[in-house]
């Protein structure tokens, strides 16, 4: 099978998406561009001569980031790929950093590109939200996770077999939990990012609504895990 395709899920990112796409292509990867119901059809933003090595997938209505990634993974599997690198369409993630992940990747795992939030130029955002998400991601999966909200990841195509019920930003949390429940590994490598100005960046993450959706993922899952996790913590056991 082929090794790594790159998926870029996008929804109303007309200012950045072509630059992101060309960055991926210039770094030698085939691109699966998933248009999650954008107002302007993403494929129509590209001239015919610009479409080489790009596979366009379009949702006619907005279905959420999780569904966009799943559609991209299905396309990658159809093309014969074993795993995919997923990066965001807002320009924050650098295609040149994908090699860091592919070099470190081990078959079957989910590998997260972890951002360094201690750098001076990194926006403050919600420090509590990041801490909260990371705490429960570690608790739910048994793995040390420092950037559970990072959209820069490598996924194996086997995630298509996981019983995931969410479809939007909360999907990125649930896929980690379900993957760990299946006995698979989650790892991280540090990455560098570009942080666009407020005028440049288009974000569809709703701080309250999407954060509550992520919380709800844990609320539904945790009651079934408390006895085993408490025992693991008391005995100092870690999931391998």
Regions inferred by a protein language model and the residue ranges of each:
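Hydrophobic helical membrane-anchoring modules
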Residues: 1, 15, 142, 164-240
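Short loop->beta transition adjacent to catalytic acidic/histidine clusters or analogous donor-positioning motifs
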Residues: 2-4, 24-33, 53-54
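Short, well-formed alpha-helical segments that are part of the catalytic scaffolds
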Residues: 11-26
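Donor nucleotide-sugar binding loop of glycosyltransferases
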Residues: 13-16, 38, 65
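Short beta-strand/loop segment that forms part of the nucleotide-sugar
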Residues: 21, 29-38, 57-59, 87
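A conserved acidic beta->alpha catalytic loop
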Residues: 35-44, 91
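Acceptor/aglycone-binding surface of glycosyltransferases and processive sugar-polymer synthases
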Residues: 55, 61-63, 67-78, 95-169, ...
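Short beta-strand-to-loop acidic/aromatic patch adjacent to the donor-nucleotide binding site
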Residues: 81-92
């Amino acid at each position: 099978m082929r090794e790594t395709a790159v998926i870029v899920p996008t929804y109303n990112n007309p200012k950045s998406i072509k630059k992101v796409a060309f960055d991926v292509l210039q770094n030698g990867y085939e691109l699966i561009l998933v248009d999650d119901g954008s107002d302007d059809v993403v494929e129509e933003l590209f001239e015919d001569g610009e479409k080489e090595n790009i596979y366009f997938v379009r949702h006619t209505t907005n279905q959420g980031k999780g569904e966009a990634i799943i559609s991209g993974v299905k396309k990658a599997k159809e093309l014969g790929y074993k795993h995919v690198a997923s990066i965001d369409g807002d320009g924050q993630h650098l295609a040149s950093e994908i090699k860091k992940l592919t070099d470190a990747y081990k078959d079957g795992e989910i590998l997260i590109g972890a951002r360094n939030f201690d750098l001076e130029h990194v926006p403050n955002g919600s420090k509590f939200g990041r801490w909260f998400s990371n705490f429960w991601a570690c608790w739910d999966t048994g793995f040390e996770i420092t950037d559970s909200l990072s959209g820069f990841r490598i996924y194996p195509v086997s995630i298509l077999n996981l019983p995931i019920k969410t479809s939007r930003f909360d999907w990125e949390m649930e896929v980690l939990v379900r993957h760990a429940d299946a006995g698979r590994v989650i790892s991280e490598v540090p990455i560098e990012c570009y942080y666009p100005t407020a005028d440049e960046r288009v974000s569809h993450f709703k701080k309250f609504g999407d954060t509550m959706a992520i919380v709800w993922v844990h609320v539904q899952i945790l009651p079934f895990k408390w006895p085993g996790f408490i025992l693991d913590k008391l005995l100092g056991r870690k999931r391998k």
